[in-house]
UniProtKB/Swiss-Prot annotation:
It comes from the Viruses. Its EC number is 3.6.1.23. Belongs to the dUTPase family. Keywords: Hydrolase, Magnesium, Metal-binding, Nucleotide metabolism. It is an enzyme of class 3 (hydrolase). Involved in nucleotide metabolism: produces dUMP, the immediate precursor of thymidine nucleotides and decreases the intracellular concentration of dUTP to avoid uracil incorporation into viral DNA. Its cofactor is Mg(2+). The keyword Calcium does not apply. This is Deoxyuridine 5'-triphosphate nucleotidohydrolase. It catalyses: dUTP + H2O = dUMP + diphosphate + H(+).
């Protein structure tokens, strides 16, 4: 292989390598909410370029050495083909290329092999791996256990989990499902887990992730029969957000915080009728800066009783109201003094999506520009 002697050529060569490694082609499958995404990138893409110099120009666009490329494909790469949900397309990270199939390259989002993600993608091709600029904050540690039924996809500012095995949810029950994925989130941050299930008769409750080592989700079956969820039917998104603990003079009637969260405790006895809901109001209030807001997330203890608490966004100078559903066929009694939800303060931006044919609304995080530092490992 020959390379141009000029310094300008060497610089352009590196920039071209970085550009090529970011080429992604999306191809949506007919009548499907899934798509295949194809990416071709190599560890050392500079090795497959051929530069030529002519009299008309001192620099020409590089051409691919087809023979060397085929040797690399046949010896270095592995075959992998998998559909990913439209909601879980990786926005950044490291990838593993795969063998050429039908004139396209299928790619799998790589599990980083315990390496740190850097942003923007492939800056190591320009700076060198040892000199890549990185954030100084502590990384968010992700431990993916071998017995997990979920695939883990890392993005710039969130984690996407997709089930790769069948999952059964008994009729008219709440199943707390262990994901066998643990997170170690640095101080000052917390996680919000939201889920989407293809089956309209099955709901995934929003979860708050603070000090939990192993993450679990709550799946609710609203039908009178057991529900079988196929691989790819459950898609979970974990967003990492900054937390805020208000000063005592900024809250009214609040209990003492537990670490970074507050408990929303019932002050009277009440019943929730079968297949119905009730709205409970609380005499709480806070007065914080305008950019701060509180999230009301269901407590897992109330889920064990068969009740579902809808996620809500609580703004300052207002009193909170909580909607509690009873999807079972029995009337449920709730005593005073029970924690039905958790309150946490943050400065993120959110909306509540009202989805068709859904009982619960869904919390959506609008902060898309933040970049986080993940460290992934497997056991």
């Amino acid at each position: 292989m020959q390379s141009l002697p000029s310094r300008r050529s060497e610089t352009n060569k590196k920039i071209i390598s970085e550009k090529i490694s970011e080429t992604i082609t999306l191809n949506k499958l007919p009548m499907s909410r899934y798509l295949h995404f194809f990416l071709f990138t190599v560890t050392d893409v500079d090795d497959i370029w051929n530069f030529s110099e002519t009299k008309e120009s001192s620099l020409t666009w590089p051409k691919i050495d087809a023979k060397q490329l085929n040797e690399y494909v046949n010896t270095e790469l592995t075959v992998y083909q998998r559909p990913f949900s439209l909601l879980g397309i990786p926005q950044n990270g490291l990838f593993k290329s795969c063998e050429k199939i039908y004139d396209e390259f299928f790619a799998e989002h790589m599990d980083n092999e315990k390496k740190y993600l850097t942003f923007p993608r492939n800056r190591s091709s320009r700076f060198g791996f040892e000199n890549v600029p990185r954030v100084n904050e502590l990384p968010i540690l992700i431990n993916h256990f071998e017995k997990s039924r979920m695939d883990v996809i890392l993005n710039t500012n969130k984690i996407v989990l997709v089930n790769r095995e069948l999952i059964w949810v008994p009729c008219e029950q709440v199943r707390i499902f262990n994901l066998n994925v643990s997170l170690n989130i640095p101080d000052g941050l917390f996680g919000i887990l939201t889920g989407t299930v293809n089956d309209t008769l099955c709901e995934c409750v929003t979860e708050l992730i603070t000090t939990e080592n192993v993450i679990s989700i709550s799946l609710i079956n609203l039908s009178s029969e057991s529900v079988m969820l196929l691989p790819g039917d459950i898609e979970l998104v974990i967003n990492i957000l900054p937390c805020y603990i208000p000063e005592p003079w900024e809250t009214y009637n609040f209990p003492s915080p537990n670490f970074i969260k507050f408990s929303l405790i019932t002050n009277k006895d009440f019943y929730v009728e079968s297949n119905n809901y009730t709205i409970q109001n609380f005499d709480y209030m806070f007065d914080c800066p305008d950019e701060l807001k509180a999230l009301i997330i269901a407590n897992k203890e109330i889920l064990c009783h068969g009740l579902v608490v809808e996620t809500n966004i609580w703004l300052k100078n207002t009193t909170p109201s909580v909607k509690i559903f009873n999807p079972t066929s029995q009337r449920i009694f709730v005593q005073a003094g029970i924690c039905i939800a958790t309150i946490i303060f943050t400065c993120g931006h959110f909306i509540l999506k009202l989805l068709p044919n859904r009982v619960l609304n869904q919390l959506a995080v609008l902060d898309k520009t933040s970049m986080l530092w993940f460290q992934y490992s497997t056991e």
